[in-house]
Curated annotation (Swiss-Prot):
InterPro entries: HAUS3 (IPR026206), HAUS3_N (IPR032733)
Subcellular location as annotated: Cytoplasm, Cytoskeleton, Microtubule organizing center, Centrosome; Cytoplasm, Cytoskeleton, Spindle
Primary localization class, coarse: cytoplasm
Highest taxon above the source species: Eukaryota
Gene Ontology CC, one term: microtubule organizing center
Coiled coil: 91-123, 290-319, 392-428, 463-494
Protein's name according to its UniProt entry: HAUS augmin-like complex subunit 3
Keywords carried by this UniProt record: Cell cycle, Cell division, Coiled coil, Cytoplasm, Cytoskeleton, Microtubule, Mitosis
BP GO annotations: cell division; centrosome cycle; microtubule organizing center organization; spindle assembly
Function field: Contributes to mitotic spindle assembly, maintenance of centrosome integrity and completion of cytokinesis as part of the HAUS augmin-like complex.
Amino acid sequence: MSGGDRFVQTLQKLNYPKGAQLDGEDFDWLFEAVDLKPFLDWFCSAASEQNVVPDEKLQAFNTLKESGKPVLDEKALDEVLKTFSISKVPAIEEVAIEKLEEEVKALQKQKNLHIRRRNKLQMVESGNRQMCLKSKDKEEETGRAFQEVLHLLRVTNKKLNHELQSIVNGVQTLMSFFSTPETACELSSQPIFLSQLLLDKYLSLEEQSTAALTSFTKEHFFEGMSKFVEGSDENFQLVQLNVNSFGEDGTTEDKCKEMMRLQLAYICAKHKLIQMKAKSASLKVGLQWAENNASVVQDKASQKEENLKVRITSLKNETLQIENHTNSISNEKLPGLVRDNAQLLNMPIVKGDYDLQMAHQTSCSSRQDLVCDHLMKQKASFELLQLGYELELRKHRDVYRELGSIVQELKESGDKLEERLTMLSDVNLLSASKPRSNIDSKDLTSHRLYQLLDGDNTQKLFRTYDGLESVAQKLSQDIASMRDQLEVSEQEHSLLLSKLDSHLKELRDFMYPEGNTLMLTTPELSGEFHQLGSQLEKLNHITVEILGDLQLKRKMLESNKLQQIEKQLYVYFFQNEEQLKSIVGKLEAQTGGGSSA
């Protein structure tokens, strides 16, 4: 409860007329004053209805004031009573009066003693009331804190139970992942890891693919070759030439014989062709000559037979020469040329053979590429599967290590929990029916905690739990104050940094007005600096003049005492009026004494 609320409650107890309309927050500032706080605490704890003057006495006092009669205070009333007693009491009763005075003094002392005791009791009562109020407030705060802590513990317990249940479910799920299935159907129904997958179908497909690839290779690279060779008798020699490209040495002689047979057939056919062409050419030439000379023969039929015979003999001789020349060409030159041309026959044959080999090689390379692609795919699938198994094995090993470390930590925590339980089951730590206020000497943990929180290493005879609680509260308050100070310092630091950044930005903008060039001085600043220089020169000149005037006035004051007195009076007039009045009074007295003399 705040101080303002306690003050308002006290006023309401004293039956203040407008106490219900007051707000305690409006009076909190009164308790911040150091001088007023003790009085206000005493007033809130000790004031009661007995300290309030009743309305009847107030009304009688007000009527006495309004009547105009004088109201004497305590001292004046005592003096009046003394004079009254002196004037009225006879001298015979002086002894009795002295006794009465002694009794009065004794009673006064007793009264003072009772008053002091009453004040002490009131102070004790006020302290007890204050302690009661504090204890009630503390009890309420403790109850609220207990409820909050209880609620927090319940929420924490629920969260902990939920987390533990989720951990148990997760562990069960994890154990179901790593558990060995009893049947293959259970494994194939819900595969979790790669190692749990059945690879029979995949391996059977790979075996079928490998068998198909093997049969394809045998058919197209081994068995298909013999079928292609045995398929036709006409292409036997060409295929034998192609087979030689694979490195078979048995068909080399057959190839040479075949080439010689082809060359010989080519030579014979070429020789016959040339002879036939020569005969046909001779026949064509004879026919053409006969056609051309038929008219001439008819015209010259009448010529002499002698000229004809001579002509016939000359023609026969020419014919014989031509035949001899033709025979020499056909027997000597033509066979050599035909043999040379027969050798040129090998070029298209060899070219065709090489073309066939190139086509076969291209076909084989394409088939080999297909086979290689299939093998590479198969190898890649196997390597990918192997990599997946290796990664899964590595993950399983990591999980195994982590589970081992978790099991070890759980064992250690279980051992520590057992140690704590055995420690807490100690008889000395059990709560007694009457809680102890002092800390037991065997409770070393509480003593060490007290030393740690208090920071005092001195040996104390008794240490209480209340002191430990107060030290802990003080530590928490210090921590809260330090956190508040840190927050305030961080805010001030951030504010200073922001101001510094803004000032730096302004300075940068001011020093770099055009972006890149540094401006040490601006025209405005240079003009102001020149103006300040001129003003400083004027000020210096004025200062020199003032110093000259001061020196001159000092010389005048030193030489003239009247001016010194005048100066002193001016100083007193502005600084010390009392001194001026005393001096003026002295002067007036002197002038008055001189005039009377």
